[in-house]
């Protein structure tokens, strides 16, 4: 759901005449090219759907093969996310584009890195990049409670929630 909504948002911005871009700190569950490099699947989908003029290599600094939570994929693949790398990539995209749609890597409390050296959560990325959020949720049983808890957690921790999409 998040990737589809991000693609719709990026497309709407591009169709409105803005130099729009997309960014995601970490993406897991990707397939390999014949040369062994990973294809950032979510980034590719958004780029193609929204017709963005942006190279895939600028869209996501951490790309993992295993379809696991980013912190587990990072541990298994030996490439843990570093906040300065995420910030630098985001700033570079912002310098080249008028507006950037940022997709979360999981929910607000999803760990991107959780090892003996550092604990990095999606919440940290949202705070450090100064982002406002739109919560994207499935319209299923139990979702209202989950969304309200997420929104209240975010507000209590100073994170702006601009909307909710079911």
Give residue spans per PLM region.
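Glycine-rich phosphate-binding loop signature in dinucleotide/nucleotide-binding domains
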Residues: 93-98
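Conserved catalytic-core segment of NTP-binding enzymes
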Residues: 9, 99, 104-166
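N-terminal phosphate/diphosphate-binding loop that engages ATP/GTP or pyrophosphate donors
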Residues: 4-80, 84, 89-92
């Amino acid at each position: 759901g998040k990737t589809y909504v991000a693609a719709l948002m990026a497309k709407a911005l591009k169709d409105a005449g803005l130099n729009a871009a997309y960014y995601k700190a970490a993406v897991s569950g990707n397939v390999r090219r014949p040369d062994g490099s990973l294809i950032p699947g979510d980034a590719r989908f958004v780029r193609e759907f929204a017709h963005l003029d942006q190279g895939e290599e600028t869209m996501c600094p951490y790309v993992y093969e295993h379809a696991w939570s980013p912190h587990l994929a990072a541990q298994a693949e030996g490439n843990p996310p570093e906040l300065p790398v995420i910030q630098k990539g985001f700033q570079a995209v912002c310098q080249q584009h008028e507006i950037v749609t940022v997709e979360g890597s999981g929910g607000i409390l999803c760990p991107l890195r959780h090892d003996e050296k550092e604990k990095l959560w999606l919440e940290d990325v949202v705070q450090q990049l100064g982002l406002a959020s739109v919560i994207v949720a499935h319209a299923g049983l139990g979702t209202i409670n989950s969304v309200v808890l997420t929104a209240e957690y975010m507000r209590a921790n100073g994170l702006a929630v601009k909307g909710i999409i079911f």
